[in-house]
From Swiss-Prot:
PANTHER family: 60S RIBOSOMAL PROTEIN L12, LARGE RIBOSOMAL SUBUNIT PROTEIN UL11M. This is Large ribosomal subunit protein uL11. Part of the ribosomal stalk of the 50S ribosomal subunit. Interacts with L10 and the large rRNA to form the base of the stalk. L10 forms an elongated spine to which L12 dimers bind in a sequential fashion forming a multimeric L10(L12)X complex. It comes from Methylocella silvestris (strain DSM 15510 / CIP 108128 / LMG 27833 / NCIMB 13906 / BL2). Forms part of the ribosomal stalk which helps the ribosome interact with GTP-bound translation factors. The keyword Magnesium does not apply. Coiled coil: none annotated. GO terms for biological process: translation. One of its GO terms (cellular component) is cytosolic large ribosomal subunit. One or more lysine residues are methylated. Keywords: Methylation, Ribonucleoprotein, Ribosomal protein, RNA-binding, rRNA-binding. It comes from the Bacteria. One of its GO terms (molecular function) is structural constituent of ribosome.
Amino acid sequence: MAKKITGFVKLQVPAGAANPSPPIGPALGQRGLNIMEFCKAFNARTAQMEKGTPIPVVITAYGDRSFTFEMKLPPVSYFLKKASGIASGSKTAGRGFAGKISKAQIREIAEKKMPDLNCASVDAAMTMIEGSARSMGLEITG
């Protein structure tokens, strides 16, 4: 018989930097999960990644207080900032540009992020990522 799922916890945790302080501690503590066990397992799985990379994680809590977690790829905004070399997006998106990004870089991001996106083709994924880039104040060049 399968374990009974009691809930899901969605968090965005920096790679290699999971610790019991907020937001991880309270989110897992509410479900009665072992916080340190998650932190150790997460840090072990993200040890080879660049430290500080934001990693979305979905934690599945079970009735016997055990858990499993699934890591996803970093958010599109992280890839866009890294590709364009900016620290943050434009404060006045649509009027001022914070940086530039090429269609080739957008295609590369779309191919990398494809498993996490809900689109059928790379072209559809590119359209979604271009929208995110415009929202961040990035100029899209040929």
